[in-house]
Amino acid sequence: MAFLLNTLKFLLWIIRHNEIDTINLYNSITPYIQIATGGNGNMLNFGYWGHNKKTEYMNPMQAQEELSALIGKFGDFQLSHRIIDAGSGFSAPAAQWKSSYDFLDIVCVNINSQQLSTASKALVPLIATTTGFNIINANINNGNVSTADATRQPVTSEMCGNIISLVNATATTLPFADECVDRVVALESAQHFKPLQHFFKESARILKPGGLLIIAMPVMIGSTDGKINWSPFIHQFRKLGILYFSWASEHYTLDSIESSLKSEGIKIEDIQHIGHYVYEPLANYYIQNRKLLKKTIKDNLSSYVQVMSFEIVENIIYRSALKMKNLSQKAIIDYVLIKCEKI
């Protein structure tokens, strides 16, 4: 019975993918991801595997660091001062950016208080090695920041310095004063924001004129099947197959994202399509190392129920990896970097 309940619970998290389900899903799978990557992997993105010889020998952690570094260059962080990292996970990208651009003030916003608590502990060792590096933990143990709280107590410029701050809040109601930052970054997190339009509206509100919104996210390419009026569910399921369920996020098209950004007065400066350097090499890595990864994780499972649940979930992941590679090769899905300017 426990086995069936655990499996059903996991499947419901994937299918429904509301905010609470996403939190539960990430909290559930993250320990296994960390085991598979050596126990210290705190980045939660697909990674950028580039297109040169060194990437042939990359592992997922190295690819994730490459993607994080790419965001810093793409987002012109060297010209920035204050950054909001929306959907910051364990704040590992923020720590990497702080190491590369030590003058930055970075505010990590995450609705997942458990991840923020872990981040606060993981960031502590960096204080001793980075000049002017401090941590402010805001609302970590107080649940999610409500819309009312965000309105009453915005984070102002005077409260920020040369620091990394951790703020427990939703990206669709950002608790910050108007025009107080010059970068808003969503590194593989915007696909979870519901409704995404609210995140764009909030980003436009808190960005200074000329500030940049930087997005890295999976997308679907195209929005229609000719003149056939498919319902959204049927249309997406026909295209994505098993990924419709295992891709545990919203399935936004690039066209819809561009339209939403423009409606908020945000000018798109650049879009880079990097799907072939994300999905296909990641899928290849998993396929080639599947046996070892399975053994590594199963060796850390303590009960028969856990092993059986893992076998089911792993089979879904494997089939999803095959499908992801196929859809990327067919240009049905892509991974995009979007740079936008507040006019």
Please identify what each model-predicted range represents.
Residues 214-239:
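Conserved class I S-adenosyl-L-methionine
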Residues 172-184:
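A short acidic, Gly/Pro-enriched loop at the edge of an enzyme's catalytic core
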Residues 197-212:
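A short glycine-rich, Lys/Arg-flanked "PGG" loop and its adjoining helix->strand segment in the class I
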Residues 183-195:
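A short SAM/SAH-binding and catalytic strip from SAM-dependent methyltransferases
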Residues 61-79:
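Conserved alpha-helix/loop element of class I SAM-dependent methyltransferases that forms part
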Residues 228, 240-327:
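Substrate-binding/catalytic lobe of Class I Rossmann-like enzymes that use SAM or dcSAM, i.e.
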Residues 82-128, 132, 136-139, 156-173:
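Class I SAM-dependent methyltransferase SAM/SAH-binding core
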Residues 1-37:
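N-terminal auxiliary segments of SAM/dcSAM-dependent transferases
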